[in-house]
Structures are given as C-alpha cells and as structure tokens.
C-alpha cells in the first residue's frame, strides 16, 4: 500500500497538493474524483466531499488532511528531509504568506474567474480582498 492516498480533481486546487507530494517524493495512490459521483471511500475520509484530500497511512493509523495549504504544511512537517518547512526565524512569514495565499488571494482569483466584481470598497473589504 502507498504511504498516502491522494483524492483530487484536475480542475481543483489539488495540483498544489500534488506538487507538494512530488516535492517530498511521497509514495501515493492518485484517485480522481468526479464532482457528481464521489466514491464512498472518499466521503468516509472527508464527509465535506472537498478535494484535495490526502489520507496518510501512518504506522499509528490513518490521518486525513484536506485543504491545499493544510496538505502542504502537513507534508513539510512529515518530511523534514525535503526541507520545505521554514526555520524558526522564518515561521511567522511562512504562516502569514501561506494563509494569505490560501485565503484572500485565492478568493480574489476565484471571484475574477467567475466574473464577479465587487461594486464598492465595502464589498472588497467584506470579501477579504483588501
């Protein structure tokens, strides 16, 4: 059995998690998820039904991680030999920029792709764009 099971859809943010899996040279099974027909194994691991999701088949038992940024941080922590994580002095910036990219930047890009434009500075603020 592979060390990880990776559930994703090519049109999701799963490519970010896939990159991280490759960076740590993880042994993983790649499972493509159809948006409308989510398999029971996937929903048992992640009842929210969101991709990407990984299952880490650790010696102490299976661990489920979802959300691209969380998967990247988890893999960096589990595979220190890959040197993806920060030093202690870099930790604050590492967390700030990781969550900024996963939050406001991602929301703004998605809104733009969906052709949604905030109509006022108040809407931009409420959406977390600024």
What are these regions (language model features)?
Residues 1-126:
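GST-like domain detector, emphasizing the conserved glutathione-binding G-site
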């Amino acid at each position: 059995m592979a060390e990880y099971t990776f559930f994703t859809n090519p049109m999701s943010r799963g490519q970010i998690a896939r990159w991280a899996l490759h960076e740590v040279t993880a042994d993983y099974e790649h499972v493509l998820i159809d948006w409308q027909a989510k398999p029971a194994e996937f929903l048992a691991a992640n009842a929210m039904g969101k991709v990407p999701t990984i299952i880490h088949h650790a010696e102490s038992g299976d661990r489920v991680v979802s959300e691209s940024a969380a998967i990247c941080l988890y893999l960096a922590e589990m595979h220190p030999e890959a040197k993806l994580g920060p030093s202690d002095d870099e930790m604050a910036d590492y967390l700030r920029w990781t969550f900024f990219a996963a939050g406001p930047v991602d929301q703004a890009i998605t809104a733009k792709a969906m052709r949604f434009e905030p109509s006022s500075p108040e809407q931009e603020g409420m959406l977390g764009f600024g």
